[in-house]
Amino acid sequence: MKPKIFIDGEHGTTGLQIRTRLAERDDLEVISIPEAERRNKDLRADYLRAADIAILCLPDDASKEAVSLLEGHNSTRIIDTSTTHRVHPDWAYGFAELAKGQRERIAEARLVANPGCYPTGAIALVRPLRDAGLLPADYPVSVNAVSGYTGGGKQLIAQMEDRNHPDYLAANNFLYGLPLKHKHVPELQLHGRLDRRPIFSPSVGRFPQGMIVQVPLFLSELEGSPSLAKVHAVLTEHYAGQDIVEVVPLEESAKLPRVDAEELAGKDGMKLFVFGTEDHGQVNLVALLDNLGKGASGAAVQNMNLMLGK
């Protein structure tokens, strides 16, 4: 019998991407609520309870409601793509490459919180250095990032693409989250194993999909004042054998004139780079990914596969 998958919110940006991916699969049965009945709470509850795995592609409050509809019904496993449960101790964090044993935790979990797109890149860079003891827990980490505008959902997509939209945005690039209170920061701090709240400065570019995340560090402030090669070796060892996360060789990175945010658009992979100069004692760690791929729908499908033993 094929496992039943219900995407609650399949008409949103992430939900549509997941639905498209699963449409090509013949090993699953995707059950869909009629669009006209999406706000029928009782019917949604029936679909949620009928599923083996429910993938929630909803705003935070709506995700909380969906989870409440499954109270006392533990046979349905949940993947939540919202921010709601990413720092909740009862939910497995859905970044399979986070640490040793994380794949198994996801595979065995009933409740999985899909990571945010920005934290996926930042944590991918920071966590290995923390686990290896190179990055002090109290280091004042700063994260700078730019995302494709699809990360803002249907509203931002319309504002960027429709010139007749009343709130049309003509900017080619803009900063937001200016008070430094972005909702991804708690997730980044917890799963990055940082004692000190990191500074996170996100921005959006005039391109649909893609993302660059940067974490600049002073080598002299890291444990043992490591070389670029040592930092690179830690990342390489951490992701050895992983098929989705690639650590670009140091020599190859040194030859690059630029990094294109759209390089991995439409793909599920993530590339990590180590840039810098020994002379100045500075390193810039860079993650390249698709905000809707490894940063959202790709990760959700990866987690679903792990939960199904695939």
From Swiss-Prot:
Q: Which SUPFAM superfamilies match?
A: Glyceraldehyde-3-phosphate dehydrogenase-like, C-terminal domain, NAD(P)-binding Rossmann-fold domains
- This protein's source sits in the domain of life called Bacteria
- One GO term of the biological process aspect: L-arginine biosynthetic process
Q: Where does the protein end up?
A: Cytoplasm
Enzyme kind, highest EC tier: oxidoreductase
Show the active-site residues: C117
Identify the main location: cytoplasm
Gene3D superfamilies hit by this protein = Dihydrodipicolinate Reductase, domain 2, NAD(P)-binding Rossmann-like Domain
Give yes or no: UniProt keyword Metal-binding: no
State the GO CC annotations: cytoplasm
The pathway to which it is assigned is: Amino-acid biosynthesis; L-arginine biosynthesis; N(2)-acetyl-L-ornithine from L-glutamate: step 3/4
| Its job | Catalyzes the NADPH-dependent reduction of N-acetyl-5-glutamyl phosphate to yield N-acetyl-L-glutamate 5-semialdehyde.
Family, per entry = Belongs to the NAGSA dehydrogenase family. Type 2 subfamily.
What name does this protein carry? Answer: N-acetyl-gamma-glutamyl-phosphate reductase
**Organism of derivation:** Brucella melitensis biotype 1 (strain ATCC 23456 / CCUG 17765 / NCTC 10094 / 16M)
Q: What is the lineage of its organism?
A: Bacteria, Pseudomonadati, Pseudomonadota, Alphaproteobacteria, Hyphomicrobiales
